[in-house]
Amino acid sequence: MFKSSLNVLLCSAILLVTSFASNAQDSMHNSWNDLITKNVLAINNGHSTAVDYAAIKQQHGKLTSYLDVLTAVSQSTFDAWEKPKQLAFLINAYNAWTVELIVSNLASDKHPDLKSIKDLGSFFSSPWSKAFIPLLGKTRSLDDIEHKLIRGSGRYNDPRIHFAVNCASIGCPALREEAYTADKLEAQLQEQTVRFLSDTTRNIAKGDTLSISSIFKWYGDDFEKGFRDTNTLGEFMLQYPKALKLTLEQQTMLKNGEMNIKFLDYNWELNAHR
């Protein structure tokens, strides 16, 4: 009887410690969550968001403090986390440093009227290739986070990340109005996917033609790597017939490879609240 009770107590203690550790790891994103909850606004019937960069600039210290928290995470600490914690961390890092890139250049002498994140690049390099991010023991670029740590690591194989990372442009999937966290990551990624695919200004089926975002052209390979047994872009799309408003006939055509796929122009205008 005593031994049984002791085992129950030990199991309860382990669960409590595990829960506390999980909450502590997710709590690092609290300040980011607070910042974007207050300064990211849903538009376009909830399909998109607009960012009040000017307001965030007024609270720049809060943003930089959060970035310092991310910088303090060591590679060994990161490696010890479960995959959802890692991926939530990397998505938040990408989004927060993108906002930092915009805010630090907003209304500056060099960019008094910033129109697009692409204005922050040059003829020789893009803004995404700039190495300005101290993360996991190295100075990295936004490209490093997305293409090496997330896509290139082989750890995650989840194409839905393309609807979570935000490039500060109108054509991008919405910057989510809350931080990504391990415990909610699956639901958050799923909601972001539906949110983007159901936006008829960026993805729409008419007759035998499916017009979709250029994201699917640039990163098409990511949708052909077996995520949830989908090995083609069409198979991935068929996971979301309701979001895409596909008729039964269109679903059959897509399944049989009979739908024409058209990639829409991308809007690189800054996703700023006006």
Label each PLM-derived region with a short phrase.
Residues 1-10:
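Bacterial N-terminal signal peptides that target proteins for export
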Residues 18-19:
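N-terminal signal peptide c-region/cleavage motif recognized by signal peptidases
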Residues 26-80, 84-89, 98-274:
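Interaction/scaffold regions that mediate signaling and macromolecular assembly across diverse proteins
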